[in-house]
């Protein structure tokens, strides 16, 4: 999967993955993380998610990373915000108040860039990537945030052979293999959502589970 895949999806407005409301799991489970006010939250592959506004409204600073510039521009236009635009290395930065959206490749992000982030929110990043890229994504993510960081990860679990992604199937075993050496993982909830997902029903999927993980970075085992 190449970068232009997502660029074209945004240009053609093929964004069925975009939610027209704040994610209910975020609202339910984020407060229990107990983060300090004004903690900086890393949101990979953020799109124009309404979750960004919700996080800012709760008193957090938001660092969203998004490849498609159209998504970033749409976010600020739809919320009638006038961003300040600057350059940070290879990233074009759009900033307004507590929200910064960095337009560019997530894999160009460095630990120095995220040194002041102490939280992570991944609703649509890991499940957006095919398996080889997920391995690379997880390895890169593991090296970004400082120890003690907390966050939420939301995945979808189904038989990948029944339907092509995205969103891709990310099974519990994979999450634990990719992240478990660095992050403490706790399943907050898992829910069968097949009945709510016409695309998957129509595609012949027989089981679809949405799973929410609570993350706490403990550092690599020695």
From Swiss-Prot:
GO terms for biological process: methylation; response to metal ion. It comes from the Bacteria. One of its GO terms (molecular function) is thiopurine S-methyltransferase activity. It catalyses: S-adenosyl-L-methionine + a thiopurine = S-adenosyl-L-homocysteine + a thiopurine S-methylether. One of its GO terms (cellular component) is cytoplasm. InterPro entries: SAM-dependent_MTases_sf, Thiopur_S-MeTfrase_Se/Te_detox, Thiopurine_S-MeTrfase, TPMT. Keywords: Cytoplasm, Methyltransferase, S-adenosyl-L-methionine, Transferase. It is an enzyme of class 2 (transferase). Its EC number is 2.1.1.67. It is found in: Cytoplasm. S-adenosyl-L-methionine binds at residues 10, 45, 66, 123. Gene3D superfamilies: Vaccinia Virus protein VP39. PROSITE patterns: SAM_MT_TPMT. Belongs to the class I-like SAM-binding methyltransferase superfamily. TPMT family. This is Thiopurine S-methyltransferase. The gene is tpm.
């Amino acid at each position: 999967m190449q970068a232009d895949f997502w660029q074209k999806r945004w240009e053609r407005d093929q964004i069925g993955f975009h939610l027209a409301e704040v994610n209910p799991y975020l609202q339910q489970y984020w407060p229990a993380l107990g983060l300090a006010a004004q903690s900086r939250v890393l949101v990979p592959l953020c799109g124009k998610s309404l979750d960004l506004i919700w996080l800012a409204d709760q008193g957090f600073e938001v660092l969203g990373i998004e490849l498609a510039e159209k998504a970033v521009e749409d976010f600020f236009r739809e919320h009638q915000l006038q961003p300040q635009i600057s350059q940070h290395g290879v990233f074009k930065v759009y900033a307004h108040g507590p929200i910064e959206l960095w337009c560019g490749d997530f894999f160009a992000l460095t630990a120095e860039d995220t040194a002041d982030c102490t939280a992570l929110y991944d609703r649509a990043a890991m499940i957006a990537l095919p398996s080889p890229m997920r391995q690379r994504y997880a390895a890169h993510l593991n090296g970004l945030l400082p120890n003690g960081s907390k966050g939420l990860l939301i995945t979808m679990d189904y038989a990948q052979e029944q339907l092509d992604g995205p969103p891709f199937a990310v099974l519990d075993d994979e999450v634990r293999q990719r992240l478990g050496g660095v992050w403490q993982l706790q399943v907050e909830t898992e829910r069968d959502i097949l009945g709510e997902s016409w695309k998957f029903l129509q595609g012949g999927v027989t089981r679809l589970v949405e799973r929410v993980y609570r993350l706490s970075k403990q550092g690599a085992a020695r």
